[in-house]
């Protein structure tokens, strides 16, 4: 339906927005006008959709044959909110904006029924709240998720939702952004969100309901509802305190509380004005920019420049996993959770029994916490089988190797796979550092080989580094990206290099942590500064959790392979004391039996003091700002090299690796966006300053040519 619409008699009814191609359809059935949002994939409220709604409401009110109006969504959803294709463009706020659109609906002289299915989120839910009535089918997801991109709902959601659900329920939804099933909300005592939960088909049911209420006057309106103050007078204070812990350092959740509290004190128009003021204050903030970057970057990560969406994929209906250890078991769970049959291979029955036991224990813990139904647990376990023979996995569509991180061991595995696997099977390695090109070359089918670097625990961590060797076929890349989506991973493509994107950059972060404690910082100070910046854990706590012996083994290899790279000797000194981390009760910190709380260690401090003495170093005072700058900018410089070398396709891919796999604070957007927001000329100046430190690695702090070029041109990574 374009700029104009034809009424039932055939006369052209002109739209007030005649220049806009409408993304809606309009049809009158038995006295009910049905306006369908038709802007796939989620019927986003772009300019043309908003104009179509306003035009349809006006046309229906002008037509004497229309008694009531239904607004619904074409396809599988009602409305997913704003049109992300228009984010940041003039169209996003062009007339009619969402406020005017909702006001037009609310002020309609004829009743407007929202017919909701699939999804009603963000502006879609706000649109529905502006209607006089709302009917919904079971299984619809209802949410106001704006808080997750650093803003508050901007079209009355914080004012209208408390009026129909009550303060407590609305506060929970708005501050978390979590979706809630429609049937749960429809059954909530005293709710006024839904007028009817429909059993049958949505549109016929909505039309029937519209005919029932067509003559009812006065028209109901959320505007007329009052907001009862919460039963607990401290509810808002407690909500703010809880959010300070659960959504640490995030501004938007706190401002959501302010808006909901305003709904209890102001009339609707004043409340909406307050909400709008808060929205406008947040939308241009650094946090909102970072959170939007994360939102779009996650979606962009799945796009590979030379692998178009039309690339054919290979079927993956079952997988094999080699290795039943912690990583192998976690990988198996990823596929079991997605309903994909898994065959797990080990060399000894005891290893299989131990692996199955760990998988069962993980699932049983979820059942005990109410996060997994018993029948779902049993169904997932029924998809798991085991074997001691490579011959039994020959027909798997994909096999993932998760054995010890040693090239010779992995080469033996891939030689066996090459001999037994069916033609076209995808052969994947879970290596975290090894050369996937060389792994592929031990087979006669290198095009079928790809790296799939899962992060531990694999069934929990969202990141999946997809390592593309120089041999990997394009259809293999397309297939593994599709598989990653199925198992709910954020897949980021990396080229082949030592450590790929994540571990290569993380090594520089850890190197700086070592230099900092050599120069005078304490282990606790470095960790606390990193955590105050927003990291989930500081570098030394991460080392204790992962196992300090792992980093030790990697360093011993690099001393041989890269003798010119400078490392602090503190980490070796600590590891050589047998302090391998939490698993042995002592690492950079001491740990009491059965507890994970880190306790400062006198033995570690003595080891650091000895390293300083051996090097003739006098410790100096180091500020928290210097700690953070050196930790983060070391990753930025390495990230710039990674971009220059083509290891990462784009800067946002690097950011997604760090946001989803390394605990980088999401509200800072990742290391590369952080550098952009700091300003690349300032980043270059800081690196030049760090080069003057005689105890650091001056060669490393030479800014990457790409970084220097972008800074000189006034450009950014993203």
Language model region names:
Residues 72-75, 429-431:
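Glycine-rich beta-strand-to-loop/alpha-helix junction loops that act as flexible
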Residues 73-104, 120, 148-151:
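Glycine- (often His-adjacent) and acidic-residue-rich active-site loop
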Residues 38, 50, 90, 94-98, ...:
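N-terminal glycine-rich phosphate-binding loop for ADP-containing cofactors
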Residues 10-74, 88-89, 100-103:
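Conserved CoA-thioester-binding segment of acyl-CoA-metabolizing enzymes
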Residues 4, 9-10:
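Residue-identity detector for glycine
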